[in-house]
Design a protein with these regions (language model features):
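Aromatic- and glycine-enriched pocket-lining scaffold segments that form the walls
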Residues: 150-248
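Hydrophobic h-region of N-terminal signal peptides that target proteins for export
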Residues: 8-18
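C-terminal outer-membrane/trafficking sorting elements
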Residues: 413-459
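CBM-like carbohydrate-recognition segments
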Residues: 20-128, 143, 163, 167-182, ...
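Mobile, glycine-rich extracellular loop/lid and propeptide segments
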Residues: 124-137, 144-156, 160
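Positively charged n-region of N-terminal signal peptides that target proteins for export
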Residues: 1-4, 459
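Noncatalytic carbohydrate-binding groove/subsite architecture in carbohydrate-active enzymes
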Residues: 209-210, 214-275, 282, 287, ...
Length: 459
């Protein structure tokens, strides 16, 4: 059955007056190349934790954190998707091959994606570490259509949801039927001999909203017509189940952890514990956007915009994204970029594009000009030759990949706006359906099309 995905560029009405930016399409590609040159261990094809490292051995010796590796893995997929959107065959081939090498390197590093191995060096010992990979692997399947990516994505989701017989935990899902209150728990403790969860255990935004995102992606990609599994701990679920659980977890997390677009870090036994973090805002935006796309309920879109508005009105300084200095916190901007892309391009909210580009310009202006990498603090110049962690450095290339300098925001050339909105067109402007609807895309040959003034890749 044909599948199609929205790709990078919104072809909506022309933007209001544009600011002038000094970064170009080639500069953006180079920023990703520079990131990989400094941080990718090309022997193992996993990422190092900082620029002074020679090798990425393990958690204790040079390798970036397991969950951040998933964010860096997202970036190579984004590079490939952008190359597809731009019709750049050479880069498509390059990044498809690089993606495969990184996938195999990460799999080899992390116990062959055995999510029941909870060793604290190369294994899986926190629920959200696993769920970030669930998301990245689901996206890999959506991008490259290789069944193994979907298999590991589903296995990891179910391992988090139901727990592991080998590890002995009872799963992240805070089942209301068990009196646990709803949502998702962040961890199990002790790691090697877990106790059953209690209602007051920590339920964080960083597991709840990624769970929603993962469930939405799996709903979008698993086949229809599956039988309902009967095992106590299944390794896959039905298409309908994933959407049902996405909506359930979102409803709990939105009610419990969010106030007017501001996302709390989590909750123990009392009220929400508010501390602003950019990645929590990002995953709230992403979860809201995906549910809007799947259900058509505009309330989800409005919540996504509330989350974005809170960032730019309350968390930014002069419109520049906040930078946090805690271990691994530099990666937060890369996560935010991922889901702001969804809001801007896939949900048509181009009013945020200028703010994202402003941040890209500041990041670019404050890079180390010799190495091409940034310290992640867009308000502070990066000292030449200084030690930089890969988490913080990921912000610049992540933004550059997701918000192309050469975006076409003008209507399809030579076609009245009303007709362009209604029809399906090839990239060169040939009409293939004058009254196009998204469901018609499945009847077309594989390739790139414009439908509803958005680029769509049909597989």
């Amino acid at each position: 059955m044909k599948r199609f995905i929205l790709i990078l560029t919104c072809i909506g009405a022309a933007l209001a007056a544009r600011a002038q930016y000094t970064f170009t399409d080639s500069v953006q590609w180079q920023s990703y190349e520079d990131f990989n040159r400094i941080f990718l261990d090309t022997k193992k094809h996993i990422y190092r934790d900082h620029s002074a490292r020679v090798n990425a051995v393990d958690r204790w010796n040079g390798a970036a954190a397991i969950w951040c590796q998933a964010i860096f893995y997202d970036m190579v997929q984004n590079a490939y998707r952008r190359a597809v959107a731009q019709g750049d065959k050479a880069r498509q081939d390059k990044y498809k091959a690089l993606h495969r090498r990184i996938y195999l390197g990460e799999k080899a590093q992390y116990v062959n994606f055995n999510f029941d191995d909870c060793n604290t060096n190369t294994g899986w010992f926190v629920y959200d570490d696993i769920m970030w990979w669930t998301v990245a692997l689901a996206r890999a399947y959506e991008t490259f259509s290789s069944r193994e990516y979907l298999t590991y994505s589903e296995r990891s989701f179910c391992r988090v949801w139901y727990g592991s017989a080998r590890v002995g935990d009872d799963g992240s899902y805070a089942d209301p039927a068990r009196g646990l209150g709803g949502g998702m728990f962040w961890e199990w403790q002790p790691i090697d001999k877990p106790k059953p969860h209690q209602k007051g255990d920590f339920r964080s935004a960083c597991i709840n909203f990624p769970t929603v995102i993962a469930a939405c992606l799996l709903h979008r990609n698993v086949p229809e017509g599956r039988a309902v599994p009967t095992a106590a701990r299944p390794t896959q679920q039905t298409k309908e189940w994933y959407l049902e659980k996405a909506r359930e977890i979102y409803a709990w997390a939105d009610k419990t952890l969010v106030q007017d677009g501001r996302v709390a870090d989590g909750i123990h036994g009392g009220g929400p514990e508010f501390k602003d973090h950019l990645y929590n805002q990002g995953t709230y935006i992403g979860a809201s956007c995906l549910l809007y796309q799947l259900t058509g309920d505009v309330a989800y879109l409005n919540k996504a915009k509330q989350g974005a508005n809170y960032v730019f009105s309350k968390m930014c300084r002069g419109g520049i994204l906040p930078y946090e200095t805690g271990v691994e916190q530099g990666v937060y901007a890369a996560i935010f970029a991922q889901y702001m892309h969804t809001l801007v391009y896939e949900c048509g909210q181009i009013q945020y594009l200028g703010m994202m580009r402003r941040n890209m310009q500041w990041a670019w202006d404050h890079r180390d000009q010799m190495r091409g990498v940034s310290n992640g603090n867009f308000l502070k110049s990066t000292e030449e030759g200084s030690q930089i962690d890969s988490y913080s450095a990921s912000a610049l290339p992540a933004l550059m990949l997701m918000f192309p300098a050469g975006d076409s925001t003008s209507p399809v050339q030579g076609v009245p706006a009303a007709d362009a909105q209604a029809g399906i067109y090839t990239i060169d402007g040939k009409c293939v359906a004058s009254q196009g609807a998204p469901e018609q895309l499945g009847q077309l040959a594989s390739g790139m099309y414009i439908c509803g003034q958005r680029k769509v890749l049909v597989r």
